[in-house]
Amino acid sequence: MSLDIQSLDIQCEELSDARWAELLPLLQQCQVVRLDDCGLTEARCKDISSALRVNPALAELNLRSNELGDVGVHCVLQGLQSPSCKIQKLSLQNCCLTGAGCGVLSSTLRTLPTLQELHLSDNLLGDAGLQLLCEGLLDPQCRLEKLQLEYCNLSAASCKPLASVLRAKPDFKELTVSNNDINEAGVRVLCQGLKDSPCQLEALKLESCGVTSDNCRDLCGIVASKASLRELALGSNKLGDVGMAELCPGLLHPSSRLRTLWIWECGITAKGCGDLCRVLRAKESLKELSLAGNELGDEGARLLCETLLEPGCQLESLWVKSCSFTAACCSHFSSVLAQNKFLLELQISNNRLEDAGVQELCQGLGQPGSVLRVLWLADCDVSDSSCSSLAATLLANHSLRELDLSNNCLGDAGILQLVESVRQPGCLLEQLVLYDIYWSEEMEDRLQALEKDKPSLRVIS
């Protein structure tokens, strides 16, 4: 292996002693070191620590999904305390770190003024560990900008020290506390901290945190006051239509420049969708929206599609998987696919579109004005009857690059029609996803031959 490289990136590999000895010189000189799920032991952590002490070039260290434990993490952190260390990004996600190990981590943060990103998700830090961590984050020498704390066993009690960090750190840009039971009280404390903070927050992720409709008024104020905010993730919280009505005035505020909004599985219906459509019409900045897992129904689909045809809506990615759509709404989506010049990605899987609905979509995709690049139609009750329309569309459409038809009953007859179109030079598809579809050995041979004959295409199954 050449030693003249900038990055060492190894994933899911059990490292033998010989292989490890080969890698050690690289640890001493690479700018980026990623050893993801490599079965690292405490002894290996000592080797890593020694190597890091003599590597002033290190900018990123990723040790995620290794059972380092508090002792192993301590060893690694000792290596980062060299005066020459200039690390910017550290990931210890899923490393069996506990609250007891947060004291050492807190002390280390005081000595790493260059560290900008810290990933600690999937470690059981608890409230006591988070308190220790925040003491380090509050040190004037710590200039952290991005902190990920997903699945860290935090409660509302952790939100007070986090809010103190937000108030004290003007450089803070991204906070992820998803999948922690901070609940309504904790979210309110965080929002107050953000309200009082001079930080230019760019991303706030609170998915599956027990956010309620009452919190949406607090969040509305944050969205309205933080012009820097670009991403808000609130998925898997019980916001409901009432919460959407509270949140939307903030999204409509003139200073709001939100780009990405994730509100999947939030109990939103067509009524809440109507409020959201006002935002889509008014905010050209909003580019990515996930409404997956909300019972929007065909009425919600109609409202969305009418909005997508408005000149003020410049959405590029729409996720409406599992939204209780039927074939009845597909004529609306077909119009969007034919006329909208901004929508590049549509995730509409797990809706009962059936053959009639997919054939409607194909009519829109086949129009010269279609710009869609990625389409997910997995688990949409599609049969081989739709494959002739899909096959013709793949030849007529020159923008589509990815198509997912997984978990549909296409069979050999349907797959053959797709293969015959995809193999043509005029078809520009780059990725065809066919999980959970059953075909014969003969068809398997055809698919393998297709990939061999057309290297630009990947068939994923």
Curated annotation (Swiss-Prot):
Entries under Pfam families matching the protein = LRR_6, LRR_RI_capping
List, alphabetically, the InterPro entries matched.
Answer: Leu-rich_rpt (IPR001611), Leu-rich_rpt_Cys-con_subtyp (IPR006553), LRR_dom_sf (IPR032675), LRR_RI_cap (IPR041302), NLRP_innate_immun_reg (IPR050637)
Chief location of this protein within or outside the cell: cytoplasm
List the disulfide bonds in this chain: none
Keyword Repeat part of the UniProt annotation: yes
Residue positions where Phosphoserine is found in the record: 91
**CDD domains, per the entry:** LRR_RI (cd00116)
**Localized where?**
Cytoplasm; Nucleus
Molecular function GO terms recorded: ribonuclease inhibitor activity
Q: Identify the stretches annotated as LRR repeats.
A: 20-48, 49-76, 77-105, 106-133, 134-162, 163-190, 191-219, 220-247, 248-276, 277-304, 305-333, 334-361, 362-390, 391-418, 419-447
Q: Where is this region: 2 X 5 AA tandem repeats of S-L-D-I-Q?
A: 2-11
At what positions is N-acetylserine found?
2
Q: Name one GO cellular component term.
A: angiogenin-PRI complex
Query: What biological-process terms (Gene Ontology) are attached?
Result: cell migration; regulation of angiogenesis; regulation of Arp2/3 complex-mediated actin nucleation; tRNA stabilization
Q: Which UniProt keywords apply?
A: Acetylation, Cytoplasm, Leucine-rich repeat, Nucleus, Phosphoprotein, Repeat
Read off the domain note. The LRR domain forms a horseshoe-shaped structure that interacts tightly with target RNases via a large protein interaction surface on its interior side.
Per the entry, what this protein does is: Ribonuclease inhibitor which inhibits RNASE1, RNASE2 and angiogenin (ANG). May play a role in redox homeostasis. Required to inhibit the cytotoxic tRNA ribonuclease activity of ANG in the cytoplasm in absence of stress. Relocates to the nucleus in response to stress, relieving inhibition of ANG in the cytoplasm, and inhibiting the angiogenic activity of ANG in the nucleus.
**Subunit info?**
Forms high-affinity heterodimers with RNASE1, ANG and RNASE2.
Output this protein's name. Ribonuclease inhibitor
> Per the UniProt entry, what species is this protein from, by scientific name?
Pan troglodytes
Q: What is the lineage of its organism?
A: Eukaryota, Metazoa, Chordata, Craniata, Vertebrata
